[in-house]
Design a protein with these regions (language model features):
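Core nucleic-acid recognition elements
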Residues: 1-193
Length: 193
């Protein structure tokens, strides 16, 4: 099935805040003593379905973004746009592993099916991207990623300082679970001599 990517980020400007990014920045300082100048966030939605990307793009502000405080795009990674013109120090993308229940994705799927009821096999997976500015030089981005996700149920992709300079951004794909093979139960002789 084709996959459409939708990304949403808080607008920047007077009186506008990236609350998710601010929470991460403050928590890093409180828990680890790590001072970061700015953390910006991007909410991502991977839509696996037959609805054309153009139809999804026309409804982004209805389902995925609040157009007053957020900016959303379809099939474009926001980190490549003018909204993120300054080169960050690190970019970390976190999403659920295949087969793990994605509750925000399930809620998004319900809303999607309300708008596009004919695409009844559609499903949505979500992810969060954190864009770090003013990260200390000695900060290990793999350690940083470990503080942002639960390795048992989530996967993280990282762009370190060098990859950010080269504009090589982490891009998660739809988490398709592996096919489950049913094995016929077999009788076991439990008789002991």
């Amino acid at each position: 099935m084709p996959v459409t990517r939708v990304e949403v980020t808080p607008r920047q400007g007077d009186g506008m805040r990236d609350v998710r990014g601010d929470v991460v920045r403050r928590q890093l300082m409180a828990d680890h003593g790590l001072s970061v100048a700015t953390v910006r966030s991007i909410c991502g939605y991977l839509i696996s379905g037959e609805t054309p990307s153009s139809a999804v793009a026309s409804r982004v502000d209805d389902l995925f973004a609040d157009p007053i405080i957020e900016h959303g795009l379809t099939n474009t990674m926001l980190v490549t746009t003018e909204s993120f013109a300054a080169t960050p120090d690190a970019v970390i993308t976190v999403g659920f592993k295949p087969g793990v229940t994605d509750n925000p994705g399930k809620a998004a799927t319900d809303g999607f099916l309300t708008l596009f009821p004919n695409d009844d096999d559609a499903s949505i997976a979500t992810y969060l991207t954190y864009v770090f500015y003013g990260l200390p030089q000695d900060c290990d981005v793999h350690w940083l990623a470990g503080t942002l996700h639960n390795d048992l149920i989530e996967r993280a992709l990282i762009a370190d300082r060098a990859e950010c300079e080269a504009k090589t951004w982490p891009e998660l794909n739809f988490p398709t679970p592996p096919e489950q093979v049913f094995i016929e139960p077999q009788a076991v002789d439990l008789e002991v001599d």
